[in-house]
A protein has these predicted regions:
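HTH-adjacent hinge/linker in prokaryotic transcriptional regulators
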Residues: 1-36, 44-52, 66-72
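Residues at secondary-structure transition points
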Residues: 2, 6-13, 17, 38, ...
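Glycine-rich SAM-binding Motif I of class I
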Residues: 41
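An N-terminal domain-start capping segment
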Residues: 56-57, 190
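Conserved phosphate- and dinucleotide-binding cores of soluble alpha/beta proteins
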Residues: 63-192
């Protein structure tokens, strides 16, 4: 878990505040998709113990953490497991994910430009994130301000327009926040 451990040690206070705010978006009985990002993984620290949910995830770590809650039904999407992220990827995972429906997808991203282009270098996982967004009534982007950059890198994953809400910290670039407002995307800014 060296990769996930190293990601989870960056901007810890921000990630925890973002994760805590994300919990407020859950309703008992919801069917949700939980992404494999370190910010999304922090949600388990704040979930009410007895909340009833159905959680689907490709993250092996998240599946095990959510499975500790008595009223959370966990569906772990299978497939080839990445050595770096400890999450499933590939055609088996994609096919299953495309057959499901979620009220909300909580998505973490590695990189987003000020104008809202989301990119990644994790080619196997890009298709899964796209499918989760497509299969969800609502998609929420969870990202600390360190993810915002000037230029895109690698492969396009999505755009800001694919999300109904962004939860980020108070150090987020003002041009990025203005872009969210212009696109009428709900923004929740948290203080670490």
């Amino acid at each position: 878990d060296v990769y996930m451990d190293s990601r989870s040690q960056i901007n810890v206070a921000e990630k925890k505040a973002i994760a805590k705010a994300a919990i407020a978006e859950l309703q008992p009985g919801d069917s949700v998709y939980i992404d494999d990002g370190s910010t999304v993984a922090a949600m388990t620290q704040f979930i009410p113990h007895n909340i009833q949910l159905r959680v689907t995830t490709t993250s092996m770590s998240a599946a095990l953490e959510f499975n500790k809650f008595p009223n959370i039904d966990v569906i772990a999407i299978g497939g080839r497991v990445s050595k770096t992220t400890k999450s499933a990827a590939g055609p088996i995972a994609l096919e299953l994910l495309q057959s499901m429906y979620f009220k909300t997808a909580f998505i973490g991203v590695p990189y987003i430009t000020v104008d809202g282009i989301i990119t990644s270098n994790a080619i196997d996982e890009i298709h899964l994130k796209k499918a989760a967004i497509a299969q969800s009534q609502r998609s929420i982007l969870l990202m600390d301000s360190s993810k915002i950059h000037k230029e895109p890198i690698n492969i396009k994953l999505a755009s800001l327009d694919d999300f109904q809400m962004v939860i980020t910290d108070s150090r987020a670039d003002s041009n990025f926040l203005a872009n969210c407002m212009e696109k009428k995307i709900q923004v929740n800014i948290v203080e670490p």
